[in-house]
Amino acid sequence: MMSEPGAGLDRQCDGLTWRFRVRVTPKAKKASVGGLHDGALKVSVHTVPEDGKANKAVIASLAKWLRVSKGRVAIVAGETSRLKTIVVEFKSQDEMNTADAKLKKELS
């Protein structure tokens, strides 16, 4: 697994898989993905953090933002915390390159 700075985001890449941290703001007025907080991608969702609703919203937001299906985005650590570890599995190198370009553009 190699480390990728990716425009300031603390991200590890292994083949077609990314692992990175997100900092979640639940009950936000505006849902958004973008910006950094201590090396973690900031994700804001409208949903309240109860019964996994905010986690589902985080997965949906990230999947839409990265243009992958929700089934290929998973929270692997921090399910009850604002700081979560996310794994994204891409189908192809082209799909990963497209997401990487978007990430670098949004965070630069």
UniProtKB/Swiss-Prot annotation:
UniProt superkingdom: Bacteria
An annotated GO cellular component: cytoplasm
InterPro entries: DUF167, YggU-like_sf
A Pfam family the protein falls into: DUF167
SUPFAM superfamilies reported for this sequence: YggU-like (SSF69786)
Alphabetized HAMAP family for the sequence: UPF0235
Protein name: UPF0235 protein RB8260
